[in-house]
Amino acid sequence: MLFDCDALSPEQIRIISGHSAITFMATMENGLLRPLERPRLDYLEEDLPEILKYKGKTSATFTRAMINVALSASAFQFAKQPLTVLDPICGKGTTAFCALQRGMNAAGVDIDTGALKESADYFERYLKYHGLKHSMKKVSETVGKTSVPVTKFVFAGSKEDWQANNNRMFNLYQADTALTENLFRKNRTHLIVGDLPYGIQHAPVSGSRTESFTSLLNRVLPSWFNALLPGGAIALSFNTLTLPTQKVQDCLRSAGFELCEGPGFTGYRHEVEQAVVRDAVFAVRPANASGN
């Protein structure tokens, strides 16, 4: 990527350094490249979202891009405190691991017990392998008449961070994603980033019946809206062959979100494989929006 600009401020260099696919930064002077020092933004090693392999895994690079774009759309891009990223359909946790690697707090909600266990087991092994101070506990939270199992991690990226109480949190909730607003009523999230189910083998289920993708969105988006802080942003990727972009946009508008449009927020449609043509949309919860 090449662009003309005035001299970059340290804050601008920091933001560009967080690009999802960056390997090198330089300025061009008299036809020569002068390397720019990249500030280290990582809280954990870059391999965290890469090691766990499974069929259907979303690219960590694409996931980081979604987080970055959502952050730029939100009111929290320049916040100094660690933000929280929620994936309300988290599966085995790629979104969460990308967020944790960058020093954010992360939370995931999913109904799949096996996927959540694999995610938690992997993260615990990762922390132990790297000798990182941490605690892990399994608790249960009650939502109405529903008992929700929760796995909670508190950890630090270094011994010094642990001693200074500069810790991060990672929570996994085994629940129907429609309960998200109840789970986060007291601690709303800054960003929601999720990869919607792609095809019939991943079709959403409501109760004992298979649910259409549009029905799923109409059922859960109001809950996600209420779990998000005013000024927060949502990023969703999906297979356009089973869920057209226009339908996703319409569902977001109906739930109260304000769509992000224009350069940087559109043009993400691309082929992943024969049966998957992926796109992404971005929206915000307006700062003055009403909600629970």
Where is each model-derived feature located?
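Non-catalytic accessory regions of SAM-dependent methyltransferases
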Residues: 1-6
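Class I S-adenosyl-L-methionine-dependent methyltransferase catalytic core
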Residues: 7-11, 18-20, 27-86, 90-292
